[in-house]
Amino acid sequence: MTNDIKEIQTIQPGLSEIKEIKGELANVKKRKRRSKKINKLTDGQIRINHVSSEKKRRELERAIFDELVAVVPDLQPQESRSELIIYLKSLSYLSWLYERNEKLRKQIIAKHEAKTGSSSSSDPVQEQNGNIRDLVPKELIWELGDGQSGQ
């Protein structure tokens, strides 16, 4: 029976050992805690900085929209403009540009074929012989990505 008591004592720490472990854990916790970050700005200064940053962001956004309005023919500077209207009219204009670009490329190819008397593949952009690519400069070839269509 005394062996059983000794085994229990070795398995279970005594009260003094528990207090010692708790003290060590408390010291570890104290070392891990960080002091609260001290903000050098007052609440008023923080608010003023936030307001001025937001104002700069809005001004930049307005300037970009103004540039877009100047470029897209359907948008007039004097009309009231919502972002949605600007996006939709810009998308419509870009689609028109893609279609127009494709028509012009086909006209160039047709004129070339009429001059040379040869016919090219159905998709001149994909043609590998180089003749069509020489006719139409690379910067003039616009292609819509997969899943996109010119409305």
UniProtKB/Swiss-Prot annotation:
It is found in: Nucleus. Residues 112-137 are annotated as: Disordered. Keywords: Activator, DNA-binding, Lipid biosynthesis, Lipid metabolism, Nucleus, Phospholipid biosynthesis, Phospholipid metabolism, Transcription, Transcription regulation. The keyword Transcription regulation applies. CDD domains: bHLH_scINO4_like. One of its GO terms (molecular function) is protein dimerization activity. Residues 116-131 have a biased composition (Polar residues). It comes from the Eukaryota. The keyword Transmembrane does not apply. SUPFAM superfamilies: HLH, helix-loop-helix DNA-binding domain. GO terms for cellular component: nucleus; RNA polymerase II transcription regulator complex. GO terms for biological process: phospholipid biosynthetic process; positive regulation of transcription by RNA polymerase II. Residues 45-97 form the bHLH domain. Efficient DNA binding requires dimerization with another bHLH protein. Present with 521 molecules/cell in log phase SD medium. Transcriptional activator of phospholipid synthetic genes (such as INO1, CHO1/PSS, CHO2/PEM1, OPI3/PEM2, etc.). This is Protein INO4. It comes from Saccharomyces cerevisiae (strain ATCC 204508 / S288c). The lineage of its organism: Eukaryota, Fungi, Dikarya, Ascomycota, Saccharomycotina. The gene is INO4.
